[in-house]
Amino acid sequence: YEEGKKHLLWAFWDERGYQRFEEWRMGVLYDTFEYEYYENGQLKEEPSYKNRMKHGKWFRYFPDGEISGVREFSKGVRVGEWVDYYRKDEIAFKGLYNNDKKDGPWIWYYMNRGAVGEQGNVMSEVDFRNGVLISEKCYTREDGEIINCQEIFGENDYRFADQKN
């Protein structure tokens, strides 16, 4: 406290078990962020904020501490390369955001490297321009043959769950 008002960084655990931090300046809440942990104590996500907005790289972790994903934000907006992993640097998907919209190639991979076929372990390649789907290809795991993407993903295609078109 300073002059009877909350001041500087305050840390506490909330009712959900998240570790919260609040930055106060002479009684005015300036910024807040939180950390979520697995039951084993391992950090789930390492957020980064600036002026109360998501900003910078966010790292996500598996319960054993391995990185499960990397996200990037600029002033609360999704930007840059986003990557999720299965395990030990084995990529599940990767793609780019530009001004909160998917932009350029997004690639989803089958688990376990070494799948046969020209496309290796690529499950699908989707090309976006400013958030709009331009083209899409899906591949069979066995021989890399191009197939209808519905055969892999079905009607509830999670690859487009965040689209705001």
Predicted regions: what they are:
Residues 1-165:
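Glycine/tyrosine- and acidic-biased, solvent-exposed loop/turn segments at the edges of beta-strands
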